[in-house]
């Protein structure tokens, strides 16, 4: 081989590695650029997802707040309705109790009115007995009148009617005694001397006050 040919071969060997190094650098640069672009896209997607997630969370929080307000309003309405129902129930209960008391009062008043009228009949029986004491009793009239009066008294007792007949010397009770007159007496001044007509009470209520005479003061 000539000197010129050897020189050309050496030159070719020397230039070949330099060409390979340049190609490698270009490949590495292209790879770095691709990775950077991918990273940017990932970061952009993450940002978009974060924004969307934040919007979803905000919407959910607003919905929760709205539902909480609606629940509070519903609870207030339920409480108000419950209170109104309880008030109505209490009013109805009170009405029933008042109606029951009214019925009882009407019944008692009707019974009292009847008893008061019947007491006049009993007074007549007493008067008949007083008259019979001074007359003959050949026909047994007195006994019949006494039996009638006794039966009458049993009926009154069954209805809860009791007699008001104060004793001499008792104090005057304005609610149960009616003073007919004042007389001279050995009883203490202002006390009862005698009973002119007995009174009656029914279930603790005075149907007719006893008529009495009172010692003068």
Swiss-Prot record:
Residues 1-10 have a biased composition (Basic and acidic residues). One of its GO terms (biological process) is protein folding. Keywords: Chaperone, Cytoplasm, Stress response. It is found in: Cytoplasm. InterPro entries: GrpE, GrpE_coiled_coil, GrpE_head. Residues 12-31 have a biased composition (Acidic residues). It holds the Pfam family GrpE. Belongs to the GrpE family. Participates actively in the response to hyperosmotic and heat shock by preventing the aggregation of stress-denatured proteins, in association with DnaK and GrpE. It is the nucleotide exchange factor for DnaK and may function as a thermosensor. Unfolded proteins bind initially to DnaJ; upon interaction with the DnaJ-bound protein, DnaK hydrolyzes its bound ATP, resulting in the formation of a stable complex. GrpE releases ADP from DnaK; ATP binding to DnaK triggers the release of the substrate protein, thus completing the reaction cycle. Homodimer. This is Protein GrpE. Signal peptide: none annotated. It comes from the Archaea. Residues 1-39 are annotated as: Disordered. Coiled coil: none annotated. The keyword Kinase does not apply. GO terms for cellular component: cytoplasm. GO terms for molecular function: adenyl-nucleotide exchange factor activity; protein homodimerization activity; protein-folding chaperone binding; unfolded protein binding.
């Amino acid at each position: 081989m000539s000197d010129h040919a050897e020189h050309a071969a050496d030159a070719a060997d020397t230039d070949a590695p330099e060409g390979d190094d340049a190609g490698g650098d270009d490949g590495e640069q292209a790879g770095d650029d691709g990775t950077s672009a991918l990273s940017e896209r990932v970061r952009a997607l993450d940002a978009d997802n974060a924004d969307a997630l934040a919007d979803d969370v905000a919407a959910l929080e607003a919905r929760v707040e709205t539902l909480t307000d609606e629940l509070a309003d519903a609870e207030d309405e339920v409480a108000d309705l419950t209170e109104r129902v309880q008030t109505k129930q209490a009013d109805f209960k009170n009405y029933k109790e008042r109606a029951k008391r009214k019925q009882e009062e009407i019944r008692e008043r009707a019974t009292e009115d009847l008893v008061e009228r019947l007491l006049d009949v009993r007074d007549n029986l007493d008067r008949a007995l007083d008259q019979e004491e001074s007359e003959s009793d050949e026909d047994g009239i007195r006994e019949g009148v006494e039996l009638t009066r006794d039966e009458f008294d049993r009926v009154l007792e069954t209805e809860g009617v009791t007699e008001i007949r104060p004793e001499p010397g008792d104090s005057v009770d304005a609610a149960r005694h009616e003073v007919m007159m004042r007389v001279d007496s050995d009883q203490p001044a202002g006390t009862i001397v005698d009973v002119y007509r007995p009174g009656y009470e029914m279930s603790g209520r005075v149907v007719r006050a006893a008529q009495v005479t009172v010692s003068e003061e």
